[in-house]
A protein has these predicted regions:
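Short intrinsically disordered terminal tails
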Residues: 1, 133-135
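Active-site nucleophile-adjacent alpha helix/oxyanion-hole segment immediately C-terminal to the catalytic cysteine
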Residues: 1-47
Length: 135
């Protein structure tokens, strides 16, 4: 895939993938995060032809940081308080749209967009609770 086409596809749907990558890295490193996303598409860990659908969250986080052990549990939620402060990729829904952000201790830790209408006007609906441990 050409780089500009990949960028367009990533801009439309890589929010969950970026949340997993950010969780594994522990901080935002844009050029590294984009490189990991590219490698993940090359390895079929994400599907760039399906809104950057994450085929394997654990493999994606291991690609970002192989020195940790990861687990992910999906949970339906209606508020951030239900997460008890845990690290999670949370989907906010607004109308027919949704957007994932990384949340910890009830606060948004990372949002791949500057101004998400889903987060601003929507409600949290699902969470991917992320556990990270040393190997």
């Amino acid at each position: 895939m050409n780089i500009q086409t990949f960028c367009l596809k990533a801009s439309e749907g890589a929010c969950l993938a970026f949340c997993y990558i950010r969780a594994a890295l522990g901080k935002v490193i844009p050029e590294k995060m984009f490189g990991i996303l590219w490698d993940a598409a090359d390895k079929n860990i994400i599907d760039e032809n399906d809104n950057c659908y994450v085929n394997d969250a654990i493999a994606l986080m291991k690609l970002a940081n192989p020195n940790k052990k990861y687990s992910v549990i999906k949970k339906d939620i209606s508020s951030l308080e239900e997460l008890d402060g845990q690290l999670a990729a949370v989907s906010y829904k607004n109308g027919g749209y949704n957007h994932f952000v990384l949340v910890e201790k009830g606060q948004i830790l990372f949002d791949s967009l500057d101004d998400s209408k889903c987060v601003k006007y929507g409600k949290p609906t699902t969470a991917r609770i992320i556990k990270i441990e040393d190997k």
